[in-house]
UniProtKB/Swiss-Prot annotation:
Keyword Cytoplasm: yes
Entry protein name: UDP-N-acetylmuramoyl-L-alanyl-D-glutamate--L-lysine ligase
EC number annotated for this UniProt entry: 6.3.2.7
Lineage, uppermost ranks: Bacteria, Bacillati, Bacillota, Bacilli, Lactobacillales
Catalytic activity, reaction form: UDP-N-acetyl-alpha-D-muramoyl-L-alanyl-D-glutamate + L-lysine + ATP = UDP-N-acetyl-alpha-D-muramoyl-L-alanyl-gamma-D-glutamyl-L-lysine + ADP + phosphate + H(+)
Keyword list, A-Z: ATP-binding, Cell cycle, Cell division, Cell shape, Cell wall biogenesis/degradation, Cytoplasm, Ligase, Nucleotide-binding, Peptidoglycan synthesis
Modified residues (N6-carboxylysine): 229
Superkingdom per UniProt: Bacteria
Short motif L-lysine recognition motif, span: 404-407
Length: 481
């Protein structure tokens, strides 16, 4: 429960309070209300709900519906003049985060918090950390792929970083379940829209940066994207940073006065020997590590997670066992066809991660390589040119472009846009299952491979704003082995 007095005190301390408006006019103080629930969904309110009117598409009709369900007061940046009191604020998203934090009893203070950011590798690194910490502790995890609040039950995540009301409700459930640590992926979008406003992490990890999520509804420029990524460093007590990433010198200067550790080529924490399924490291993680996920970049993700978990109480033995046990749904999953050709299913969904994926496969498969690829509609438009650039640099690839969450766009138009950046003919088959079947039918022997990129373990396609059932890349590939 939270009272109106407590609510106003939080807003005033954050300099986010304007006034309370009701039929009697303006009020600096207010009383007589307490709330047992928080909501930003007008369909889920009653007389004891504190409702947040948020979003560029919010309509007064939503508020009218909530009032008919018993709503007595709301928080907003706008007075909709509907006859009930409104708490007016300058920034509704910041208000949501701080009020949710207090409402749920500050659960962040009862968990050790580890956050990963980066253009690629967040989910893989989070899974490594989860398995490392699980050896001696009780970690919960919020990742793009899956969420677990009790270490036993996993459910599909809707957002990389949940909305603040959901985030703190889930954190509180983690505390109730006896969890000791929480591992999170923190997206640039989470900082752009203040989902984690006011939250301080025990350790923040910056894996890498490359242009992505740049478009009309995301970040307008790379500078804006990079800036919002860096906010995790400002909001972490200690940081772990990849010294091999672009703009590392800037980040090194930024974190000079806080606890930090670097890994990679310009640090003492390096991979000294790399094999397909093992690596040797020097520095704080000195030793031998077995790993199921192929690729040097996955070994670097394991290093990042290991250094972070070392700060959170994990032993070197915990880290070794955790790395050896880690598998990630939809990340570098490998199938073998009856003719011994390989099928790689991976979530690679931007130019940088696609380049890494192709390079790893080319190390191991020297025959005909087939790539199945698409790009999402109505977001991350810059990826399309990036995909074309990467494909152009791999001339031996046979490419089939297909649908990947086309949303409100025509998947064929998206494919044609990608194709416009490739200086050789490519095939377009918009039906993703047909594209996979066609590619697999062209493989003839053990040196050949099909690379299915983009959707990973997702068992749906986003079409016209809705999740439409889709068997999933892995299930389809298994069917045609």
């Amino acid at each position: 429960m939270i009272t109106i007095e407590q609510l106003l005190d939080i807003l005033k301390k954050d300099h986010n309070f304007r006034e309370v408006l009701d039929a009697d006019g303006y009020h600096y103080h207010y009383q007589g209300f307490s709330f047992e629930r928080l909501s930003y969904d007008s369909r889920q309110v009653d007389g004891k709900t504190l409702f947040f009117a948020k979003g560029a598409t919010f309509k007064a009709d939503y508020l009218k519906e909530a009032i008919t369900n018993g709503l007595q007061l709301y928080i907003s940046e706008v007075d909709y003049e509907l006859g009930i009191p409104v708490v007016l604020v300058t920034d509704i998203k910041k208000a949501m985060s701080l009020i949710a934090m207090a409402f749920y009893g500050n659960p962040q203070e009862k968990l050790k918090l580890l956050a990963f950011t980066g253009t690629k590798g967040k989910t893989t690194a989070a899974y490594f950390a989860y398995h490392m910490l699980k050896e001696s502790y009780k970690p919960a995890m919020f990742s793009t792929m899956n969420t677990t609040l009790d270490g036993k039950t996993f459910f599909k995540s809707q957002l990389t970083t949940p909305e603040s009301l959901d985030l703190f409700a889930m954190m509180a459930e983690c505390v109730t379940n006896g969890m000791t640590h929480l591992i999170m992926e923190v997206s640039s979008q989470a900082y752009l829209v203040d989902r984690v406003y006011g939250l301080t992490f025990d350790v923040g990890v910056f894996l890498n940066i490359s242009p992505d999520h740049i478009g009309p509804i995301e970040h307008p420029t790379f500078e804006d994207y990079f800036y919002h990524k860096r906010l995790l460093m400002e909001n972490s007590r200690a940081v772990v940073i990849n010294s091999g990433m672009d703009h590392f010198s800037f980040l090194a200067d930024q974190v000079a006065d806080q606890e930090h550790v670097f890994y990679g080529p310009l640090s003492d924490n390096q991979i000294t020997t790399s094999q397909a399924f093992s690596f040797e490291a020097k520095g704080q993680l000195a030793g031998h590590y077995d790993i199921q996920l192929i690729g040097h970049f996955n070994q670097e993700n394991a290093m990042a997670a290991g250094l972070a978990c070392l700060r959170l109480g994990a032993s070197l033995a915990d880290i070794q066992k955790g790395i050896a046990k880690t598998r990630v749904p939809g990340r570098m999953e490998v199938l073998t066809m009856t003719n011994h050709a390989k099928v790689f299913v991976d979530y690679a969904h931007n130019g940088d991660s696609l380049e890494k994926l192709l390079s790893v496969v080319e190390e191991h498969q020297t025959g005909k390589l087939m790539l199945i690829l698409g790009a999402p509609g109505n977001k991350g438009e810059s990826r399309r040119a990036d995909f074309g650039r990467v494909i152009h640099q791999h001339p031996n690839l046979t490419v089939i472009l297909t649908a990947d969450d086309p949303n409100f766009e025509d998947p064929e138009d998206i494919s044609k846009e990608i194709a416009s950046h490739i200086a050789r003919p490519v095939e377009i088959i918009s039906d993703r299952e047909q594209a996979i079947q066609k590619a697999m039918s062209l493989c003839q022997g053990a040196k050949d491979a099909v690379i299915i990129a983009g959707k990973g373990a997702d068992a749906y396609q986003i079409v016209k704003g809705q999740q439409v059932a889709y068997a999933g890349d892995l299930a389809i590939a298994k069917h045609y082995l």
